[in-house]
């Protein structure tokens, strides 16, 4: 009998309206968690990278004004940072800007200077479709399974 009373008392406390609310008074009964963002990378480095990306976008829009269809889809900062020398970076950038009718020398030199202050982001390598020797240039990677 005492066990029944104890059980009823515990059950009534669990079902009481004050217990139905979680900590912080949320009616859902779920604990309210403090949102905490952890960043693996240094915030300053990320801001520098973002600033360079915005600068690149602005310069490309200016260089390709009126000929946006010729503008490169992307100037991959990490790909440029992976190259061993500044000469290789320069050639890569000039290759991306082949279709540009406006002079690009100043842009290339400024971009090289900005790249000197950046570091490659660690992460998982994302191979491009051109890195896969089993695919010919005309094959669509999404619709073709490797042999």
From Swiss-Prot:
The modification Phosphoserine is found at residues 26, 128, 134, 136. It is found in: Cytoplasm. GO terms for cellular component: cytoplasm. The modification Phosphothreonine is found at residue 38. The keyword RNA-binding does not apply. Residues 138-147 have a biased composition (Basic and acidic residues). Its main location: cytoplasm. One of its GO terms (molecular function) is protein phosphatase inhibitor activity. Residues 1-36, 118-147 are annotated as: Disordered. One of its GO terms (biological process) is cellular response to xenobiotic stimulus. Residues 1-11 have a biased composition (Basic residues). Keywords: Cytoplasm, Phosphoprotein, Protein phosphatase inhibitor. Pfam families: PP1_inhibitor. Residues 35-120 are annotated as: Inhibitory. Belongs to the PP1 inhibitor family. Inhibitor of PPP1CA. Has over 1000-fold higher inhibitory activity when phosphorylated, creating a molecular switch for regulating the phosphorylation status of PPP1CA substrates and smooth muscle contraction. This is Protein phosphatase 1 regulatory subunit 14A. It comes from Mus musculus (Mouse).
């Amino acid at each position: 009998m005492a066990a029944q009373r104890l059980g009823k008392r515990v059950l009534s406390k669990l079902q009481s309206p004050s217990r139905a609310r979680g900590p912080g008074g949320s009616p859902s009964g779920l604990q309210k968690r403090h949102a905490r963002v952890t960043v693996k990378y240094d915030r300053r480095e990320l801001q520098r990278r973002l600033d360079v990306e915005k600068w690149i976008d602005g310069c490309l829009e200016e260089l390709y004004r009126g000929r946006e269809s010729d503008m490169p889809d992307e100037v991959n900062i990490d790909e440029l940072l992976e190259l061993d020398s500044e000469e290789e970076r320069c050639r890569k950038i000039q290759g991306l800007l082949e279709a540009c009718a406006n002079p690009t020398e100043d842009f290339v030199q400024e971009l090289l200077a900005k790249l000197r202050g950046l570091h490659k982001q660690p992460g998982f390598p994302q191979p491009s479709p051109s890195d896969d020797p089993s695919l010919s240039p005309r094959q669509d990677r999404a619709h073709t399974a490797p042999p």
